[in-house]
């Protein structure tokens, strides 16, 4: 039984509340807390000038601002602290304020605690956003008012009083958001797990443990959806407290969702043919299977099929940007891990000219070389990791005699120009970096948009 939001309203009134981070999700949160009568102090590394109108607006509303390099020095003396998702709970300033007696939480935790609607929580290393979007589209097609939040969509806590019990909520949840989550999801979906974000987590085990929080607090009436073909998520079944549902791209799963001989099935019934799905690639087949088995109690097979045969995909995910002189340019900027890039490469029916490299998340690139080489015609490298990636392809050449031509460049503009020079009619060029963007761009979306801008100016 979900808690009554009146309880939070009574609790937060007149409380001294610190909000760490004045970003996209926390601006609506801060405004909501003001509306509920809290005394808010907002903390951010940005300066007043960088925040612009946001800072003047908050000051006019009576919000105290602690900004600049040492912005967390004054995180003390609060009743409640809302942290940003990327802020570790064991960071020195949060440990200190917790010892003082502060209640430390996040926008997402409070939303899950008080949301009356059925919640679908989706996590995984790859496919989270696409699966989240597919689930939301399927629910909308069935006629549900559907709210999308977490890593995508809009911050939902500020809208919690508008969300009705008969609505549906779909949340994309990262390992950072889940690290402190101790609340049940009605339906928890784990698309797959592979090494990722090892620059932020102590090790792979901590990353897995964070992801497990999506289902560890469930009860007997809740549901966990796992990928039968992913060793780590399949292993979660032993710890599940509610119903477990499986999906598989490689075997028949009697009561689950599976792919066989070009057809996607749900509980033994055909939903759609693979060739009729608009977004290509086996990774998208898996995303659909996860969505079908997750929503089977809420949605008809007819509406599942309708979405699969009409949904064009999410921006920055194997997105066709343009065709010039018979050469197709794809933006797969979301691919911030080798596994994700491999999935993208396998979506094409021919070898591609691959643009890769970026910020170093301390991931291993051997799989990209050992499994990816049959799909790569030319490799163009840039960014912090270009030498690391080059080394694994050179090792492949030394050990197996398999040579991939490698070009090194300094900028995305140079990469696109080099790809254009190398391409012949009928070729495919894809930006699928296998790395995060932070060495050159603030996020993968800005990287993808820059790529599209460069391609559209050719």
Swiss-Prot record:
Its main location: cytoplasm. GO terms for cellular component: cytoplasm. SUPFAM superfamilies: MurCD N-terminal domain, MurD-like peptide ligases, catalytic domain, MurD-like peptide ligases, peptide-binding domain. One of its GO terms (molecular function) is ATP binding. It is found in: Cytoplasm. It comes from the Bacteria. One of its GO terms (biological process) is cell division. It catalyses: UDP-N-acetyl-alpha-D-muramoyl-L-alanine + D-glutamate + ATP = UDP-N-acetyl-alpha-D-muramoyl-L-alanyl-D-glutamate + ADP + phosphate + H(+). ATP binds at residues 124-130. Pathway: Cell wall biogenesis; peptidoglycan biosynthesis. Keywords: ATP-binding, Cell cycle, Cell division, Cell shape, Cell wall biogenesis/degradation, Cytoplasm, Ligase, Nucleotide-binding, Peptidoglycan synthesis. InterPro entries: Mur-like_cat_sf, Mur_ligase_C, Mur_ligase_C_dom_sf, Mur_ligase_cen, MurD. Its EC number is 6.3.2.9. Pfam families: Mur_ligase_C, Mur_ligase_M. Cell wall formation. Catalyzes the addition of glutamate to the nucleotide precursor UDP-N-acetylmuramoyl-L-alanine (UMA). NCBIfam families: murD. HAMAP family: MurD (MF_00639). Belongs to the MurCDEF family. This is UDP-N-acetylmuramoylalanine--D-glutamate ligase. The gene is murD.
